[in-house]
Design a protein with these regions (language model features):
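Sec-dependent signal peptide hydrophobic core
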Residues: 5-9
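C-terminal motif of bacterial Sec signal peptides marking the signal peptidase cleavage site
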Residues: 12-15
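A sequence/structural signal for flexible, mid-protein segments enriched
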Residues: 17-356
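Positively charged n-region of N-terminal signal peptides that target proteins for export
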Residues: 1-4, 18
Length: 356
């Protein structure tokens, strides 16, 4: 059954420069800048678009300057390959490298098509304290149906003496090493994707805190694996385990974790990325070794990032009904434009999985 979701009033009170959506009818052209930066990552990415009236369009080019603690750390423009793809997706990714860690202050300045925007000062949060991560295959049984899932457990400890906010996601990585009988070198190809996370009051009260309260009867009616939407991130606060330990328990459908299902995709990627078969003849590899792993990522984030991700996840949820539900305000923090950018600090554990 549909439950009326009461979304936290904090969304309306979040201390940001603006909010999304804004009055499209009266707004002139503004840069839309979105993305998350990751402490310690080799490459950072933000997406740039142009919003005017009720439409969003791509930009021809964009330049991003990144300042860390007041010092220019990187200047980058969009790659030519990204420009070609941006014409279809109406957002242009700009990639750059910059090094920052806990406590550093990051500011981005963005220029595109004659428009300018910037972020406020973004303080890099602490990395979550994660002691142990584990997983096992199991079956979730309900009244009339069952589902094979990969069940994850994450043991972590809250940082003492402060309010903390977190985000959680999975990254599946399938790697294929292709060999050819004509003697050409082996080619490794990697596919990364973000499986949906599911949980209920039957598994984890921390991740469910502030979401819909579902019973087993509700889960029989709704789609268990998708009822919380298909957003990339789950979010949670330390409200239920402040200054102490916690164990997160969540599931992901086993259908995402069969490497054989990815082999055809990997070969298509091989053709597109490396020009194999560009002469009209596609030599099928004599062998391909497929390996599968999943990375569990727990991110430390700001309160604003927590509210932003929670809002996006809520409006994409199968349980969200704009007629029956309180309206959701999506925070924004871009100065001179719209959108949201913030910094995450990640604790990650990669787990190798069997092929079947």
């Amino acid at each position: 059954m549909k439950r009326i979701l009461i979304f936290t009033a904090l969304l309306a009170a979040v201390a940001c420069e603006n909010e999304i959506p804004y009055d499209f009818g009266e707004a002139g052209p503004k840069l839309m800048v979105t993305g998350f930066l990751y402490a310690g990552a080799a490459e950072q990415t933000v997406n740039v678009s142009l919003s005017e009236g009720g439409t969003v369009s791509g930009v021809g080019d964009a330049t991003v300057r990144c300042y860390v603690n007041g010092t220019l750390a990187a200047t980058a423009s969009a790659h030519s390959d990204d420009k070609a793809r941006a014409a279809h997706y109406h957002q242009l990714p700009v990639r750059f490298s910059a090094d920052f860690d806990t406590g550093d202050v990051v500011v981005l300045e963005v220029e595109a098509d004659g428009y300018k925007a910037s972020t406020p000062e973004l303080t890099v949060p602490h990395k979550p304290i994660v002691e142990k991560t584990d997983t096992t295959y199991t079956t979730v049984t309900h009244t009339d149906w069952s589902e094979e899932v990969l069940r994850f457990t994450v043991d972590m400890t809250d940082r003492k003496g402060e309010d903390n906010w977190y985000a959680l996601n999975l990254v599946k990585e399938v790697t294929g090493t292709f060999s050819f009988e004509d003697g050409r070198p082996d080619i490794p190809v990697v596919r990364r994707s973000y499986p949906t996370i599911s949980h209920s009051s039957l598994t984890d009260p921390i991740l469910l805190d502030g979401n819909m309260a579902l019973t087993d009867v509700d889960l029989d009616i709704m789609d268990y694996m998708d009822y919380l939407g298909d957003g990339r991130f789950e979010t949670f606060s330390d409200q239920l385990f402040r200054d102490g330990p916690a164990r997160l328990v969540f599931d992901s459908s086993r259908q995402y974790y069969y490497p054989g299902a990815d082999s055809d995709y990997l070969f298509d990627l091989l053709i597109r990325s490396y020009g194999v078969g560009s002469d009209g003849f596609v030599p099928w590899p004599t062998s391909d070794e497929i390996s599968l792993s999943v990375e569990v990522q727990v991110h430390g984030c700001s309160k604003d990032a927590y509210l932003y991700l929670r809002a996006l996840h809520t409006v994409r949820s199968n349980g969200y009904n704009p007629v029956l539900t309180e309206p959701v305000t999506i925070p924004g923090n871009i100065i001179g434009g719209i959108g949201f950018v913030d910094v995450l600090n990640t604790s990650a554990v990669r787990i190798g999985l069997p092929e079947n």
